[in-house]
């Protein structure tokens, strides 16, 4: 089985490699929105596309053809929309939940697969590192339930 990680962040290349080792599944990665095309996806043929850190709109023709799972750094439906980490920190939150949800036409409004607690202690880099590790365990849980 093939899966795809879509992330604007280079550190998710390591996430892709780690998941491949831990699950024995093939994980490809897309780091740029120009690569997220139907033609490219058809050549990869992923079972699921995991959007671990994606700041761009996902085209409808992609999320209707492929199972697309988005990770969002709030306890949805609270905090829907852009810049969730920054908004939580500005508002003084000490922790949040990382939500894994199905991509839908309305932003951050699809059915939720699962949520896990995420501490907001430390620098943004430390928080994002913890979130990446948490995403890894959440992806494994999602795959085990399939």
Predicted regions and their residues:
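One-carbon transfer enzymes
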Residues: 1-146
């Amino acid at each position: 089985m093939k899966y795809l990680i879509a992330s604007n962040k280079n550190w998710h290349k390591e996430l892709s490699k780690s998941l491949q080792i831990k699950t024995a599944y093939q994980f490809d990665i897309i780091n740029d929105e120009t690569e997220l095309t139907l033609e490219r996806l058809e050549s990869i043929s992923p079972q699921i596309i995991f959007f671990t850190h994606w700041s761009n709109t996902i085209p409808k023709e992609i999320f209707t053809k492929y199972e697309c799972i988005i990770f969002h750094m709030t306890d949805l439906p609270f905090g829907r929309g852009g810049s969730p980490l920054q908004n939580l920190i500005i508002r003084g939150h000490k922790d949040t939940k990382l939500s894994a949800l199905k991509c839908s036409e309305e932003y951050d409004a699809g059915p939720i697969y699962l949520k896990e607690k995420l501490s907001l202690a430390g620098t943004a880099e430390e928080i994002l590192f913890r979130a990446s590790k948490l995403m890894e365990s959440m992806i494994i849980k999602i795959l085990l339930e399939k």
